[in-house]
Amino acid sequence: SEASLILPYDPILDKVLLVEQFRIGPFCRGDKAPWVYEPVAGMIEFGEKPEDAAKREVFEEAGIQVNNLVKINSGYPNPGEATTYFYNYIGIVDLSDYSPGIYGVRDEGEDIRTHVIDFKDVLTWSISNKLRVLPLNTMVLWLALNKLKLSSK
């Protein structure tokens, strides 16, 4: 299976949008906080381009349009156990009038809470190991190294 993962970023406000969802993995491990912060993510449908899936997922899970999509990387999150393949992106968005709330596709059983957070805070969370979803950490650290390039576009 293939999935697109997107970290929505507003370079003018220097803020990111994170989604928060209940996840069965942390719950089954006995984690005291099974609601986790994540990038927007979703499976790529048959015949769909990863970029198109990324834009669709941002709209479904956060209710906003992506103005520009910047590819970070792609690869296997766990090649020893699965064939899953991730396409990771930064999605340039305008968060100036955005109202965080509850989003998701009801037919898919999604119950997604969105949060708009200052990038410096998310970077601090990443460095201090408070973000427990590893692809999100990769995306945040990539953005820390490359956001000046994104701001100049």
What are these regions (language model features)?
Residues 78-100:
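Active-site-adjacent beta-strand/loop module that shapes the phosphate/pyrophosphate-binding cleft
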Residues 1, 7, 12-56, 106-108, ...:
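Conserved Nudix-box catalytic region and its N-terminal flanking loop in Nudix hydrolases
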Residues 63-64, 150:
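Helix N-cap/coil-helix junction residues
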Residues 11, 44, 66, 93-94:
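Hydrophobic pocket-lining residues within nucleotide cofactor-binding pockets
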Residues 65-72:
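A short coil-to-beta-strand element that immediately follows conserved catalytic motifs
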Residues 58-62:
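Membrane-proximal helix-loop-helix units in multi-pass membrane proteins
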Residues 8, 90-92, 116-118:
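Short, well-ordered beta-strand micro-motif
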Residues 32-35, 46, 71, 79-81, ...:
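Nudix hydrolase/Nudix homology domain
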